[in-house]
């Protein structure tokens, strides 16, 4: 009996030590901060981000539509009320991810493995560059590893009137090719698109998709997701040890879908 009594504190000490180690391991998985790169989806969100002029130019005559159906049932002890809804969403009007078939470059969202939507994040402030395809390769050279999610902060400001076209900063074709060839896991921006009409692409090709949308082509032709219209990217500047998570609804043949991306800061 004395031996058992003597050993009991030893077992308790070992058990508590193991518990502390497990707690320590769990704590290393809990982020210090979680930053939401999404926004509240409203019926007019696409117009807020694109501006009506740009929506009309591309032939998008409507934004989002919320059809809420309220219902009530009497089960004998009072009315039970609630609602269901049909949500018609413009899938590129808000924080979203592009799939290859957005530019006729392959399959839809369902071809992406789930691993494509998560990865270590590197954020770059490119607000000092002028509008257009102006962000050069040197911004990323030797600062990005294969498998990283690369995000740029452009300081995008939505059009302030219906007749004002959106202006944006995006990558040069050389920079998009550099990142895509590493390859990065995904590319992201706060601007409404990586597409730009401010200047001519610095590439010669017979491929219409490459000539028209070279930045999209670099990534989507290699099945690398593109995230656009992200919010709160400025809150990520100067932070390190970040993990990006941005999985969309897995829509069959979907060319894109709205996302609520999260960044976990460790």
Regions from the language model: what does each represent?
Residues 11-12, 105:
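Repetitive helical segments and hydrophobic/amphipathic motifs
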Residues 19-266:
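Active-/binding-site microenvironments in catalytic and ligand-binding cores
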Residues 1-4:
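Positively charged n-region of N-terminal signal peptides that target proteins for export
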């Amino acid at each position: 009996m004395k031996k058992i009594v003597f050993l009991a504190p030893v077992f308790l000490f070992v058990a508590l030590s193991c518990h502390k180690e497990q707690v320590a391991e769990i704590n290393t998985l809990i982020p210090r901060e979680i930053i939401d790169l999404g926004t509240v989806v409203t019926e007019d969100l696409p117009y807020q981000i694109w501006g009506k002029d740009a929506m009309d130019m591309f032939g998008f005559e409507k934004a989002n539509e919320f059809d809420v159906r309220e219902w009530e049932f009497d089960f004998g002890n009072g009315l039970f009320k609630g609602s269901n809804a049909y949500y018609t969403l413009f899938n590129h009007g808000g924080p979203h991810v592009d799939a290859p078939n957005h530019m006729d470059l392959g399959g839809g969202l369902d071809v992406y493995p789930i691993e494509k939507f998560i990865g270590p994040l590197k954020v770059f402030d490119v607000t000092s560059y002028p509008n257009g395809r102006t962000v050069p390769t040197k911004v990323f050279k030797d600062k990005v590893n294969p498998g990283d999610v690369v995000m740029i902060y452009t300081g995008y400001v939505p059009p302030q009137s219906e007749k004002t076209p959106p202006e944006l900063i995006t990558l040069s074709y050389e920079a998009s090719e550099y990142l895509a060839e590493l390859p990065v896991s995904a590319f992201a921006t706060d601007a409404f698109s990586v597409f730009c009409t401010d200047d001519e692409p610095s590439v010669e090709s017979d491929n219409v998709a490459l000539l028209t949308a070279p930045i999209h082509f670099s990534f989507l032709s290699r099945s690398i997701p593109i995230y656009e219209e992200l919010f709160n990217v400025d809150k990520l500047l100067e932070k390190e040890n970040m993990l990006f998570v941005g999985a969309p609804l897995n829509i069959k043949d979907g060319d894109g879908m709205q996302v609520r991306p999260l960044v976990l800061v460790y």
